[in-house]
Amino acid sequence: MIRLALKFALLATFCMGVCGVIEADEGMWVFDNLPLKHLKDKYGFEPAQAWIDQLRGSAVRFNNGGSGSFVSTDGLVMTNHHVGADTLQKLSTKEKDYYKVGFVANTKAEELKAPDLELNVLVDIRDVTAEVLASVPKDATDAAANAAKRAKMAEIEKAATTANKMRNDVVTLYQGGRYALYTYKKYTDVRLVFAPEFDIAFFGGDPDNFEYPRFCLDVCFFRIYENGQPAKPRHHLNWNTQGTKEGDLTFVAGHPGRTSRLFTVDHLKYLRDTSLPFLLDLLKDREAFLLEYAKTGEEKARQSKEDLFSYQNSLKARMGGYTGLKSPEFMASKEAAEAAFRKTIESDASMKEAYGDAWSKIAAAEIVAAKSLVKYNFIERGLGFESTLFSLAKTLVRHSAEVRKPNSDRLREFRDSALESLKMDLFSDAPIYPEYEVAKLTHSLQYWQSKVGANDEILKKALAGKSPADRAKELVAGTKIADVATRKKIAELAPEEIAKLDDSMIAIALAIDSAARAVRVDREDYVEAIETANYSRIAQANFRIKGESVYPDATFTLRLAFGTVKGYQELDGRNIPPYTTIGGTFAREQAHEAQEPYAIPKSWHDAKIAGRLKLQIPFNFISTNDIIGGNSGSPVVDKDNKVVGLIFDGNIHSLILDYGYDDKLARAVSVDSRAIIEALRSVYNAGFLADELTTSK
């Protein structure tokens, strides 16, 4: 944390959210507004439309939160082991723990069907800004305007879905400055092909997470099927078996989740002073609980391992961003950039009238957000009910009510265009472990009680006069919705029929639903609506001053980032070279006496002893590509659109990238394409898979 705090004195070149001229290799660019002139001016590279189309068409979105790419003509998709971890966990049993020991399908018949995995491939982007904004009545309040826009977005999505039978999402860009309809081809027959052991996919564990040097084979392969046969994608990426060298230009096509680079200073202060401290406390609590739970038995550790990784990863990432926001130098640079932008607006009477008070209105909204933060998170977001069974019950209760409303009046997750994906999750046959459910629910109820006190009215309703432990046992024991067939039957019931069910989880979901809906409405009307309206005004001001050469904040939609393979100098003076090697992994294991999480799997030692493993081959490398969470699994390609790497992490200095860009110290971390092929051939006896990657044209 000290290194993060010290580094912000160096951030004078950060993008402060209103930049117009591209600095360095900054930007997560939408594919219909790429920085082609900058690429040509700086690198002498001007991608042809065919190059853009191939990369866009090869990129895959994992709907559980990650990226991937087609890498063969037979529907083979590459991503990270940690993106595939959810599926690996769901496919695993006490007898076969694929998450731990890995998996290789030697034939297509051996590939394992993922229980509830949806992959999306972008096929079209259409600007619908005019349609969305035209739906807002004159003199509408911010809340009414937001409702009108949501209704229009639902209408656009439904019309598109009816016409093209694909997935259609209206995406809000520039915090409300632009709206675009993203159309995706959706795949739901997805099968596991290959995953390495956890101990090499995540070598170094949490201590090395967001650090560099790294030594990880964080890769996983799936295959998409259509009509029972391997899919034949229109586009895929070929493989560069020679890899990169320092200074090479690289590109990343992926789906960064969320950034806050366009946020106002007051909004960032809300994150720093209220939202992030709340979240960090929760993450620390959940991590401590899961660490203790894992100690109570090997099977319990297996069942909870992926959850533990997720919480630890989130905790480290959010702590890094929080440390950045706590830096006086960083916040001073944000304040200076905002002041300069506002001064430009104030100097023009028409712009002052149109946009001048947007910042103060956002500041007022954050005060409201702070007041509702605890209630909103515990009852609407469900942090007080950490339970898969409760989440399913809540979805069933709301599904019954929402689908009987006009499409435009529904909660967004229940609109017609989203229902197919929602039902895939709702009717997943992934295992649910009752004992783990009781433990999670007990702990989350206890944590909720510790934050609001035993006299909180909604908590009292949830506990029904019992202790958290007794109530959790009662709720898990008294529900039948762990059974998929039961969930399907309940999903057909009307609200009045659901209210008559004798099911504990359904009953508790019903009991708190009105309170949860109320706090959600307050959040949408008095926080999000005001933010959207006024960020839209700020975006319009920025467009008037600088045009549309500014990239929008990340929205888990397809973006292009570019950068070069480049080392850096640490704050303590150490020079960090861009590459690590396979041999370096064994040296790091020896330095840590092969203690977890620095124990290399036996398969790798066997390959080394047999002389098959080429230790000098580059394993991981770093580059200046602008990436964040959600980019995990993104392909790294060269100027020929060939795979040279696979994004899996950022270094510790990249954790501020949610709020601004830096290329002095921040780096993206990738698995080298050469290491992937070497591991497949020399460690896993999967030369057939290496051949598919390197010979597919």
Where do the model's predicted regions map?
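Terminal presequence/propeptide segments associated with secretion/organelle targeting
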Residues: 2, 9, 19-697
